[in-house]
């Protein structure tokens, strides 16, 4: 897992969900651990798309439940 991408995703998640950066780990679940609701999740996906200049299709977004899932998806898209 790319440390650079992980740090950037953690920063975005912390900002979008208004949680302390120290609470955001690679295995943190957006809804169960970080308190995100469905709207938060949509906004988070949009922020990740913008930050990494990628497109995350709805089907893929549904499979992204943790910070690690997001990092893995971004790594695959960025090649």
UniProtKB/Swiss-Prot annotation:
It is found in: Cytoplasm. GO terms for molecular function: acyl binding; acyl carrier activity. Residues 3-78 form the Carrier domain. One of its GO terms (biological process) is lipid A biosynthetic process. The modification O-(pantetheine 4'-phosphoryl)serine is found at residue 38. Keywords: Cytoplasm, Fatty acid biosynthesis, Fatty acid metabolism, Lipid biosynthesis, Lipid metabolism, Phosphopantetheine, Phosphoprotein. It comes from the Bacteria. PROSITE patterns: CARRIER (PS50075), PHOSPHOPANTETHEINE (PS00012). One of its GO terms (cellular component) is membrane. Pathway: Lipid metabolism; fatty acid biosynthesis. It holds the Pfam family PP-binding. InterPro entries: ACP, ACP-like_sf, PP-bd_ACP, Ppantetheine_attach_site. 4'-phosphopantetheine is transferred from CoA to a specific serine of apo-ACP by AcpS. This modification is essential for activity because fatty acids are bound in thioester linkage to the sulfhydryl of the prosthetic group. Carrier of the growing fatty acid chain in fatty acid biosynthesis. NCBIfam families: acyl_carrier, PRK00982.1-2, PRK00982.1-4, PRK00982.1-5. Belongs to the acyl carrier protein (ACP) family. This is Acyl carrier protein. It comes from Prochlorococcus marinus (strain MIT 9312). The lineage of its organism: Bacteria, Bacillati, Cyanobacteriota, Cyanophyceae, Synechococcales. The gene is acpP.
